[in-house]
Curated annotation (Swiss-Prot):
One of its GO terms (molecular function) is structural constituent of ribosome. One of its GO terms (biological process) is translation. The keyword Cell inner membrane does not apply. Belongs to the eukaryotic ribosomal protein eL32 family. This is Large ribosomal subunit protein eL32.
Length: 138
């Protein structure tokens, strides 16, 4: 594929992804708007109550997490920039991704420490890779 075709394909996928994500509701815990302690937890917990209207999928109540909300496989795993996101744990992982630098953005894993993070950042700059969560000035 030529560079123009790749760019247009990437842009097309990004637009599709944004449209689908806009339709998807924000899944919050039931009654999180009524009780502060639940609202703080801004994470989904499945309702199991006998008469819970959300669990029963009654109209007018929040949507419940289900399989149908998942994005298509071609669109999944993209960074907002439209590039494929790759998680990196060490410098060797960077070398593996080096030949795809036009279509990939690197994310340094959260478990990586400060020293190794600096090594990864320096190597990424050498190889000309984009890093999404630099966060540290090396």
């Amino acid at each position: 594929m030529t560079e123009e075709k790749i760019q247009s394909y990437r842009k097309k996928i990004y637009v599709i992804r944004q449209k689908l994500k806009a339709k998807k509701p924000r899944f919050l815990r039931y009654d999180s708007d009524k009780f502060f302690r639940l609202g703080r937890q801004e994470k989904w917990r499945r309702p199991y109550g006998r008469d819970n209207k959300t669990r029963l999928k009654v109209r007018g109540f929040p949507a419940i997490v289900s399989v149908g909300y998942r994005l298509p496989k071609e669109v999944r795993g993209f960074h907002p920039s439209g590039l494929r996101q790759v998680i990196v744990h060490n410098v060797n992982d960077l070398v593996k991704v080096q030949n795809q630098k036009d279509s990939v953005i690197v994310t340094i894993a959260s478990s990586v420490g400060f020293k190794k993070r600096l090594e990864i950042l320096n190597k990424a700059r050498e190889l000309g890779l984009k890093v999404s969560n630099e966060g540290v000035s090396a």
